[in-house]
Amino acid sequence: MINRDNKKAITKKGMISNRLNKFSIRKYTVGTASILVGTTLIFGLGNQEAKAAENTSTENAKQDDATTSDNKEVVSETENNSTTENDSTNPIKKETNTDSQPEAKEESTTSSTQQQQNNVTATTETKPQNIEKENVKPSTDKTATEDTSVILEEKKAPNYTNNDVTTKPSTSEIQTKPTTPQESTNIENSQPQPTPSKVDNQVTDATNPKEPVNVSKEELKNNPEKLKELVRNDNNTDRSTKPVATAPTSVAPKRLNAKMRFAVAQPAAVASNNVNDLITVTKQTIKVGDGKDNVAAAHDGKDIEYDTEFTIDNKVKKGDTMTINYDKNVIPSDLTDKNDPIDITDPSGEVIAKGTFDKATKQITYTFTDYVDKYEDIKARLTLYSYIDKQAVPNETSLNLTFATAGKETSQNVSVDYQDPMVHGDSNIQSIFTKLDENKQTIEQQIYVNPLKKTATNTKVDIAGSQVDDYGNIKLGNGSTIIDQNTEIKVYKVNPNQQLPQSNRIYDFSQYEDVTSQFDNKKSFSNNVATLDFGDINSAYIIKVVSKYTPTSDGELDIAQGTSMRTTDKYGYYNYAGYSNFIVTSNDTGGGDGTVKPEEKLYKIGDYVWEDVDKDGVQGTDSKEKPMANVLVTLTYPDGTTKSVRTDANGHYEFGGLKDGETYTVKFETPAGYLPTKVNGTTDGEKDSNGSSITVKINGKDDMSLDTGFYKEPKYNLGDYVWEDTNKDGIQDANEPGIKDVKVTLKDSTGKVIGTTTTDASGKYKFTDLDNGNYTVEFETPAGYTPTVKNTTAEDKDSNGLTTTGVIKDADNMTLDSGFYKTPKYSLGDYVWYDSNKDGKQDSTEKGIKDVKVTLLNEKGEVIGTTKTDENGKYRFDNLDSGKYKVIFEKPAGLTQTVTNTTEDDKDADGGEVDVTITDHDDFILDNGYFEEDTSDSDSDSDSDSDSDSDSDSDSDSDSDSDSDSDSDSDSDSDSDSDSDSDSDSDSDSDSDSDSDSDSDSDSDSDSDSDSDSDSDSDSDSDSDSDSDSDSDSDSDSDSDSDSDSDSDSDSDSDSDSDSDSDSDSDSDSDSDSDSDSDSDAGKHTPVKPMSTTKDHHNKAKALPETGSENNGSNNATLFGGLFAALGSLLLFGRRKKQNK
């Protein structure tokens, strides 16, 4: 809680501004363990109490016994800042009332180790700040002195092992010099530290029990002073008889250091295994201060509270670890280096896990003790307090703070707010305590002088080893420090271009100008006050003061230190502005007379779990009743946290460390295969069963009567019969046999397989030891069988199918049957034949083809069989199920596939690949036929109507000079179109009457049987080589009758040299009789081209060219042949004429 009290007083020197900030640290001692509060472990909801294990080894060797003092130490640093303005009583040039300048916001600065914490990271977004801004409030309205304190209450954990107080007088506190004490038990101090082995040994020694002091409780109650004396003697004996880390010269509070020793005492032999994945976070929250505005007033001691609730999986074992992460912008303590985390304990004080803190990563690593091996279903809650890290966040800004438990994060947006300087006139100053070192017994204070960089005259700064009052005078009491020539005072000048961090804390002074030496002659000491004369200034300065303090006689802290700045205004009046910071500690005790608070008595509950064979709910009524071991029993605390144990071999359980007046719940887990017995079967509370859940309130005594009983749940059978239903009617007939080795699977109501079995030789099966409930039975179809019809008759005689549901209700169920019948097999095949007439039909005269390969594929395309046709062309595949298949015929070499699907299925050809479906019958109609390809040989000598267009280039040397008077009657009936290109140089005057009678009788008989389109091209290939050299000079008048019978198949080679003078009358009668018989039989769709028979009888079929480019050779040959024939005729005619003549 922050308390601030602003005061206003009028003095003869003027108004004095004074501000107070309090820094609070609360510490407790429990047993031998001391806990610096900052991190509060709460094993339970709403209980902000840090628990320390009793009889722990966290004190070093000189502090190994439990003391009875329940010291709750509050350490508070307070800054008293007041501003007072008065008329001076000294002579003044002129008496005036000056207007007061605005005063800085009045929130006090509280930086504390109020509570120990652990760290996590968050992002920082710093906004630029200018500390020179004068954010002040009118001091004339009110002047307040704010007393800020933070008090967090914690209770010690109970000490079960020793209810008697064992103490010894302590004399070392009296012998110790109070001005220079050093903490002998601080493992973190700067003195040489013992090796880890020594520390472990010391901690081990600290756990050894001591001889008890024979002092009764009654004597201690009646004589509190006796108790104090025992405590002192006990402490003194420890120091004189036990080995210690350092010389026992200090009475500084040990409780601030105990937390570190928790970490040191970790057993090194336990293997570490991170089990964050086995930690389930159920709730996380981040709260700033009172949680109303999410403003972190860092100088006012506003803490950041992180609450986390989580469960620990039962798989976690001793030595396993989990992590807690702070935000990177916070620290567990901003005044001390005490960052060691508190142990995780349950409400009874048992330690669940011990923690170590990594300052670099701001992460706590907790290592679990054997608590997790002893208990189950553990629920825990942890509350961690932290403060803004002024090094990470030097100026006001907005942050998103992120904390995490076991890697599961939660975030909160916060605004960081720092104090403004106290201002009056040109006086402006602010200060905070920045570091407490209990080992060296020093306190560090940082002071900002003139942070607003005003032009200040006659500036003096006082540093007092106590608080100052409203007049700037020393105020004795309420804490002090030692300010003398041994006090470290450093002065640094801030350059004009440098801005001071609003956090009021400097971590690196090297960036500022060290002007300490300039004050060697401007620094004076008097009555525990140091005065520094700055004179006239317009720059800001930083003063770092490290002063000594003296703990109280009982080792507590009572520290105060004040500072003030005074200047004169233009009228010569003084203006004061100041701060006072203080830390105080106090003991919280059980009573006002200083006596130790009596230890709280704790209680236990428990008893017995048994098997109630006769189910009457009363223990001992049946000789067969026996205790039940390993039954899980869960205790729920009032705050909702839980822990669980299991009954031992004798059926007993127990929970201890319970508080009087509180209500607890005990729950028993029903063991598998059992049911809870009757509740309250008798009025004897020691013999009855209290049921599965019991609520009990502690009424000043133990309660060991919380019992419960269970009895075994009855078991039942399920099953019956699997048979061969030969008549396929779905009814179990007397003559139908059972089927053995049928697999049967049993599933529970969730579908989980709980058993499998197979039928015996009689087809019977049975599942045993079943509870009431719904079950599913699945039958696997045996190989070679098909499920029969189901649900055709009464339940005990029908077939329930492949899957059925069975219900057990307080009786066996032996009616779940299933029937199958043998699955019939089928055949497939038929015939492959030689289709000689190529009609695709199986004729009686056509024979089968032997050794044709046939392949059978199933529906998946897998080959399931191959065979070859026999000598009759037959093939067959047997033992086939109904289904889809594919038959593939491999075409025999040299044969051609015949036409398909030309007639009925049993007589046609089905082709090379056939798809077939068998449905409860054989299929013998899958046939295929092949034939052998024929070659066509055609002799054709024909003179047919031909339309020939030929280009003939004939080079003929003909020198003819003829005078021919020819009268020729030419009657030519010719179907021949001949285009002859002849280059002849002839001088012929011929009048020719040619009577030519040409009969072309062509008889062509072509018998063609083909299933194809036939293109017939008349291609004449004629080789004619004619070289004619004719030199003719004739003058003839001839009348000749020429009867010429020529065959158009001629190959003539004519070499003629003639010199004639003729007059001829040529009568040519040409009969061409050609009889061509062509018989072509083709079995494929192949164009068959008629061939022209030539002299060489190549008889080659040649396709017509697509472009006509190949016509030249043929046409030329024809042309030349015709020319040679004509030439031959002329020669022949010439000879005849001569003969006639």
Curated annotation (Swiss-Prot):
Region annotation (Disordered) ranges: 54-248, 929-1117
A single GO cellular-component term on record: extracellular region
Membrane topology of the entry: Peptidoglycan-anchor
Function: Cell surface-associated calcium-binding protein which plays an important role in adhesion and pathogenesis. Contributes to the resistance to killing by innate immune components in blood and thus attenuates bacterial clearance by interacting with host complement factor H/CFAH and modulating its activity. Inhibits also bacterial opsonization and killing by interacting with host complement regulator C4BPA and thus inhibiting classical complement pathway activation.
Protein name: Serine-aspartate repeat-containing protein E
PROSITE patterns listed in its UniProt record: GRAM_POS_ANCHORING
GO biological process, one term: cell adhesion
Residue ranges with Low complexity bias: 77-90, 109-126
Region (Ligand binding A region): 53-601
Chain positions of motif YSIRK-G/S signaling motif: 23-34
Signal peptide (residue range): 1-52
Ranges of Basic and acidic residues composition bias in the record: 61-75, 92-108, 130-145, 216-241
Comp. bias (Acidic residues): 930-1080
Name of the gene this protein is made from: sdrE
Annotated organism of origin: Staphylococcus aureus (strain Mu50 / ATCC 700699)
